[in-house]
Regions:
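Hydrophobic transmembrane alpha-helices
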Residues: 20, 71-74
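CoA-thioester-processing core
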Residues: 1, 5-40
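Residue-level detector of family-conserved "landmark" positions at structurally sensitive sites
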Residues: 7, 74-75
Length: 193
């Protein structure tokens, strides 16, 4: 429920660089934080999609604040890396008495109009040579997580719905030959083609 980082920590979700989406709730949490910050489903979907699609990182907790990965006043930073375990243990001890997990969030995903905007952005970037075809495939899978792709109407979702959407997108991408090739290239130190 709280994050403790070293002052030089780099925070971000970079999985799209090898053709998959973040697993384990990364897309859900990013969307949730953008939605809470803006109160607007379209903005939250667009910011989450751009951030995860480009694999944006904050080179420090301060920079990660702009990406909603670090929450000042809630999360903490230590200057000395050697103090991480000691401070984390103290945080846990302080949180433990009377601890209850947060209520599972409910979120609203925007309708498919924003999906069309995302698709047009990727098509334009592909035509200009900014992206490879599989970048578009990966980006549009991220979009399926944060947009109601079946209707123009907003869609209320639970945390579990978001986990299910993430898992489905991850598995679809993991089965593609392009993602397999990108992962193999990364593991062997070769350039991603």
């Amino acid at each position: 429920d709280r994050l403790l980082t070293h002052a030089n920590s780099v925070l971000g979700l970079v999985e799209s660089g090898v053709g998959v989406v973040p697993g384990g709730g990364g897309v859900k949490t990013t969307y949730q934080r953008w939605f809470e910050a803006t109160g607007d489903a379209d903005t939250a979907a667009w910011e989450t999609w751009m951030q995860i699609g480009y694999g944006k990182t904050g080179e420090s907790p301060e920079q990660a604040t702009k990406l909603r990965y670090f929450r000042p006043g809630h999360d903490e930073t230590v200057m000395n890396r050697d103090k991480l375990i000691t401070r984390a243990s103290a945080m846990i001890r302080n949180m433990a008495p009377g601890y209850t997990p947060p209520e599972p969030p409910k979120m609203t995903l925007p309708g498919q109009a924003i999906f069309a905007k995302m698709d047009a952005f990727m098509a334009d970037g592909l035509a200009k040579g900014w992206f490879k075809p599989h970048n578009k495939t990966t980006a549009m899978e991220i979009a399926t997580i944060v947009v109601n792709t079946s209707s123009d109407a907003p869609l209320e979702v639970t945390e579990q719905d978001m986990f299910d959407r993430e898992r489905a997108a991850f598995l679809r991408l993991a089965k593609t030959p392009e993602t397999k090739g990108w992962i193999n290239a990364m593991l062997s130190g070769a350039a991603i083609e």
